[in-house]
Swiss-Prot record:
Record's protein name: MAU2 chromatid cohesion factor homolog
Family: Belongs to the SCC4/mau-2 family.
Broad class of where this protein is predominantly found: nucleus
Keyword Cell division tagged: yes
Keywords for the protein's UniProt record, in alphabetical order: Cell cycle, Cell division, Chromosome partition, Mitosis, Nucleus, Repeat, TPR repeat
Positions annotated as TPR repeat: 453-486, 493-526
SUPFAM superfamilies: TPR-like
Presence of keyword Endoplasmic reticulum: no
InterPro entries the UniProt entry points to: MAU2, TPR-like_helical_dom_sf
Localization per Swiss-Prot or TrEMBL: Nucleus, Nucleoplasm
Length: 632
C-alpha cells in the first residue's frame, strides 16, 4: 500500500470516528436523550479497528454513558476494565486516570467492601506522579474512601502527600484545600494540637498568599467552618462566637446575587478546579453549625428556627439534584431538632422526627447512612425512652449505642445517661462501675467543657441522692464554673436548680432561693420544661416555708401547668405508631406509620460529592436536663 493510500485511509477512518462521536453526542443530548442510539454509535467505532488510544477512550465513554443513564452496571464495568487494560501501559495518556476514578466509584457502588476501589486508586496514584492534576484528584478520592472506612491515619497521610505535591507545583489554593481537609480528618481523630497547628498554617496562607479574592473568601468559609467545629468540639460556646459571626458574614458574601458562579471562580486553571462543597451546600452547612452552637448554648428557639431554614434549603436543593451529602445534612439536623424537642417537652414530635431520620437513613444506598448513624439513633431513642419513663428500654438503647460507636464523645454521652438510669433505679453497683469507668477513661483525656461539666453534674446528682450534700455542692460548683466560663446555659440552669434543691434539703432557704431564681429565668429563656417543673416545685416549698401564700399558689399553679403539659404529651407518645421504635435493638429499625414530622420542617418553602468527607457530624448539644438529670 502506498503512503498516500495509507494516509487517505487514516483520514477516512478519522472522519468516521469524528462522525460517529458527533452522532453519539447528538443522541445523548437530544430531548429526551436517545441513549440506545448513542451507545450504538459508540459501539460502531470498534468495527473500524481503531488505534489503542481511540479504543480505550471509546470504552471509557461507553462506561460513562452506561453508568450515568442505565442500570447495566455489569456492562459498564466490562467497558471500564477494558479501557483500563488498554490505557494502563500507555504513557502520557490521561484516560487511564479517568477510568481508574470511575472504576473505583463503581466498585464502591457494587462491592461489599472497598478493597478493590482502594487497590485501583493506589495503582492510579502511583502512575500519576507526573500529572499534578490527576495525582491530586486521585489522592483526594482515595483519602475520602479511607476516611469513610474510618481509616483516618491513612487518609491523613494521603492528604499530607497531596499538600506536598500541590506545594511543589506552586498550586497554593490546592495546597490550602489539602491542609484544611487534613485538619478535618485530624479533628475527627481528636488530635487537638495537630488541628490547631494546621489551621494556623492554613489561615496564614489564606490571609497572605491567595491573590484571587473569590477563592480567598471560599477558603475562608472552609477554614471558619473547621474553626467553629474545633471550638464546639471543645465545648467552647462563648469562645467560638467571633468565628461563628465571621463565618455567617462570609457565607452571606458568597451567596450574594453578584457573586460569580463556582464555574467562573474555579474553571480557569486546572489546578484550581477543586471545590470542597458547592456554595449552596456550604450555605446549609453554616446553618448546621449554627444550630449546633444554639443547642450547646441552650437557645432552643434559635436552634429550631435555623433547623427549619436549613431543612427548607435542603428540600430546594434536592429538587434540583439529590446529592448524597444533603441526606447527611438532613439526618444531622433531625438529630439536633429531636434533642431540642425533648428539652422543651415535645416528646411526641421528637419520636416523629426520630422516625423521619430513620427514613432518610434507610433510603440511602446500601444502608450507608444507617451504618454511620445507627448508634446516634439508638442514643436518641434511649433519651426518648428515658423521658417517657421506660428505663429498661432506655438502658438497652444506650448499651447498644456504646457497643456500636467508636466515637468517644458519643460513648461518654450514652454512659452518662446510663449512670442516671442506674441512679434513678437504685442500682448502686452498676452506677459505681460506670462512673469509675467514665472517670478513668475521660478525666484526663477528654477536653470538652460541655461533656466534662456534665460528668461533674452527674457526680453531684449522685452525691445528692446519697445525702452527701457537701460533696454535691463541690461537684456542682465545679460544673457551674465550667458552664459559666463558656455560656453553657442549660448546664448552668440544671446545676443551679440542683444546687437549690441541695440547699433546700439542708434547710438553707435563702441560698436555695438565690439558686432557683436564676435557674428559672434561664429555663424560661431556653425554654426547658424539666427545669421549670423542678424549679416550680422548689419555689412552692420555699414560699410555703416563708408563709408567702400567694407566691406559693402561683408556684403550685405553674407546677401543675408544666406537669399537665408533660402528661398530655406522654399520652400522645404512647398512642403514636412511632413509639414502637423503643423496641428496636438490632438490625434495621422497624417501619412505623404515623403522622409525619412537623410540616414546617420538612415541606419545601412556599420557603463529598465533596472531595473529602464532611463527617465532623457529632451531634453536639449533649448537656444535662430534667428533674432527674437527663442529658440531651
Amino acid at each position: 500500500m502506498s503512503a498516500s493510500t495509507s494516509t487517505s485511509t487514516a483520514a477516512s477512518q478519522d472522519a468516521c470516528y469524528i462522525s460517529l462521536l458527533g452522532l453519539a453526542e447528538y443522541f445523548r443530548t437530544s430531548q429526551p436523550p436517545n441513549i440506545k442510539k448513542c451507545i450504538q454509535c459508540l459501539q460502531a467505532l470498534f468495527t473500524f479497528m481503531p488505534p489503542s488510544k481511540v479504543e480505550a477512550r471509546t470504552h471509557l465513554q461507553m462506561g460513562q454513558i452506561l453508568m450515568a443513564y442505565t442500570k447495566n452496571i455489569d456492562l459498564a464495568r466490562q467497558h471500564l476494565e477494558k479501557a483500563w487494560s488498554i490505557s494502563e501501559p500507555l504513557p502520557n495518556f490521561d484516560v487511564k486516570f479517568d477510568t481508574a476514578s470511575l472504576l473505583a466509584q463503581l466498585h464502591l457502588q457494587t462491592d461489599r467492601n472497598s478493597h478493590q476501589a482502594k487497590a485501583m486508586l493506589r495503582r492510579a496514584v502511583e502512575l500519576s506522579q507526573n500529572n499534578v492534576y490527576w495525582h491530586c484528584k486521585l489522592l483526594l478520592q482515595l483519602s475520602q474512601i479511607h476516611a469513610s472506612d474510618r481509616e483516618y491515619s491513612l487518609a491523613s497521610e494521603l492528604l499530607a502527600v497531596g499538600a506536598e505535591s500541590a506545594d511543589e507545583a506552586s498550586a497554593t489554593y490546592l495546597k490550602v484545600l489539602f491542609l484544611l481537609s487534613r485538619a478535618m480528618i485530624l479533628m475527627i481523630e481528636r488530635k487537638t494540637n495537630d488541628v490547631l497547628a494546621l489551621l494556623n498554617s492554613a489561615g496564614q496562607i489564606i490571609d497572605n498568599n491567595i491573590p484571587n479574592p473569590h477563592q480567598k473568601e471560599y477558603l475562608k468559609v472552609f477554614f471558619l467552618v473547621l474553626q467553629v467545629c474545633y471550638y464546639l468540639a471543645l465545648g467552647q460556646v462563648k469562645t467560638v462566637k467571633p468565628s461563628l459571626k465571621q463565618l455567617q458574614m462570609s457565607i452571606q458574601t458568597i451567596m450574594a446575587p453578584n457573586w460569580p458562579s463556582d464555574e467562573a471562580i474555579f474553571g480557569a486553571n486546572q489546578l484550581e478546579m477543586f471545590v470542597w462543597l458547592p456554595k449552596e451546600q456550604l450555605y446549609v452547612l453554616v446553618y448546621l453549625v449554627t444550630v449546633s452552637h444554639s443547642m450547646m448554648a441552650g437557645y432552643m428557639d434559635k436552634a429550631q428556627k435555623y433547623t427549619e431554614k436549613a431543612l427548607t434549603q435542603i428540600e430546594k436543593l434536592k429538587q434540583q439534584e439529590d446529592k448524597p451529602i444533603l441526606s447527611v445534612f438532613k439526618v444531622i439536623l433531625l438529630e439536633h431538632i429531636v434533642m431540642c424537642r425533648m428539652v422543651m417537652g415535645n416528646r411526641e414530635l421528637a419520636i416523629r422526627e426520630i422516625a423521619a431520620a430513620r427514613d432518610v437513613c434507610m433510603a440511602a444506598p446500601q444502608r450507608s447512612l444507617l451504618r454511620r448513624h445507627s448508634a446516634q439513633l439508638h442514643c436518641l431513642i434511649g433519651l426518648y425512652s428515658m423521658s417517657t419513663n421506660l428505663f429498661e428500654h432506655a438502658e438497652r438503647q444506650f448499651v447498644v449505642c456504646v457497643s456500636e460507636t467508636s466515637e468517644r464523645d458519643l460513648k461518654l454521652f450514652a454512659n452518662l445517661n446510663l449512670a442516671i438510669i442506674y441512679l434513678r433505679t437504685k442500682r448502686d453497683t452498676d452506677l459505681k462501675q460506670i462512673l469509675d469507668a467514665v472517670s478513668t477513661e475521660n478525666t484526663h483525656t477528654y477536653s470538652s467543657q460541655a461533656l466534662m461539666g456534665g460528668f461533674y453534674y452527674v457526680q453531684g446528682l449522685h452525691a445528692f441522692h446519697k445525702n452527701s450534700f457537701h460533696e454535691a455542692k463541690r461537684f456542682l460548683r465545679e460544673t457551674l464554673k465550667m458552664a459559666n466560663a463558656e455560656d453553657l446555659n442549660r448546664l448552668t440552669s440544671c446545676s443551679l436548680v440542683l444546687l437549690s434543691h441541695v440547699f433546700l434539703s439542708i434547710g438553707n432557704s435563702k441560698e436555695s432561693m438565690n439558686m432557683v431564681t436564676p435557674a428559672m429565668q434561664l429555663a424560661s429563656k431556653i425554654p426547658d420544661i424539666h427545669v421549670q417543673l423542678w424549679g416550680s416545685a422548689i419555689l412552692k416549698d420555699l414560699h410555703r416555708m416563708s408563709k408567702d401564700v400567694q407566691h406559693e399558689k402561683d408556684a403550685y399553679a405553674n407546677h401543675v401547668k408544666y406537669s399537665e403539659n408533660l402528661i398530655a404529651d406522654q399520652r400522645k407518645c404512647v398512642q403514636s405508631a412511632h413509639h414502637e421504635l423503643v423496641n428496636w435493638f438490632q438490625g434495621d429499625p422497624p417501619v412505623t406509620s404515623g403522622p409525619p414530622a412537623a410540616p414546617v420542617l420538612l415541606m419545601p418553602e412556599s420557603s463529598v460529592t465533596a472531595s473529602v468527607p464532611v463527617i465532623a457530624s457529632t451531634s453536639a448539644a449533649m448537656q444535662p436536663a430534667g428533674q432527674y438529670g437527663q442529658f440531651y
